[in-house]
Curated annotation (Swiss-Prot):
It comes from Haemophilus phage HP1 (strain HP1c1). Belongs to the P2likevirus gpJ protein family. It is found in: Virion. Transmembrane segments: none annotated. This is Putative baseplate protein gp29. PANTHER family: PHAGE-LIKE ELEMENT PBSX PROTEIN XKDT, PROTEIN JAYE-RELATED.
Amino acid sequence: MSENFKQMLAESGLPTEETQIRQEFERLTAEEGLITNTSRMSPFWRLITAIAVKPVKWLTDHLIAEILPNLFVKTAKDSWLQIQAWAVGLDFKAATKAEGVVHFTKESDVTDLTIKAGTVIQTERINDVIFRLIVTQETIIPKGVLRAPVPVIAEQAGANFNLAAGYYRILPESIAGVSAVENLEDWLTSPGADRETNDELRERYRTQFSSVGQHHIDSVYKGMIAKVAALSVDRIYFKHDAPRGPGTANAYLLLDTGVTSQPFIDKVNRYVRDEGFHGHGDDLICYAMPETKHNLTCAIYFQPSIFVGDVRKQEIVQQVENMIRCAFRENNNYGVTRTYPFTVLVGRNWARKFTTTSAKLHLSYGGKSTFKASYLFHAFSNYPSQSKSKGQK
């Protein structure tokens, strides 16, 4: 891209190479006739030339690498892009903390049980990281109720805390009378989000610019949904052609991490439908991206030449499971390729996908012996319907 900006300067007649700048300086010096000692052997002339040429070269390079690219939305970044976004009423979305509920189960329902604010619920170690939720308010589980939801918030901001059901199930400090704790399906009421990236803000800018007339088309709905939700605009998918009758359309929302819960969907629908942010005659409803479930079998082979103890084997198996789950958006702690709607993972593409994943597993977890494990994973309904999908390494 920098070559394009360099070409722009060259076409305008501005020298961009050091030799060109030197030649231009020498030409101007000769025209003025103020300096006669211009021998290449002269220390004075070499000093004057360096003083004139080097700063111009620095400024030219900075102009090509920083100034010109940041004058255009497509190539601008950070504060420069922020200034561009201000022109259409946008700004970087700040990082937010995940909020939701975790269910506490009592040992007995014959008495009340109080869960104090500040109680911590955490995950097992996922790729050497432990995620924690904190109870936000004191909650009483009354007599006669065995299990009840307790409001929680993530320890830190970010999308990594939007884990799937079952990850948060450990109390680092035991509570008398509590037999179990777990985040269930639909536990998220407000997903956490990372600070918006340059590319994500650029996409929202493009959407905002295309919807400047405020006609209620896809770009407008994408803009308003992305504003209220912890989503980038490319995670919002529309179904047109009146799926629920004339004037109707559906929007399907996809989180980068975790499952899009119904309380979160309800929040977005209230904003779009009940608070007046829809067009005349429009009928748009947001849904979570539909899912199907498939059994995947993963075979882990440990190298016979390397001794691996039973405890370490179990750790490796757990890490491999978490890595595979990351590909299906249940966590965000591994650099694996994610599944996306309208992406077919069958036949050759499926094999290629698992070849890549297998290579990453091999690089991350070497070992000994053989181990097989079957896991249940999420897959999107856009994929071809299959009762089972098996990949082996």
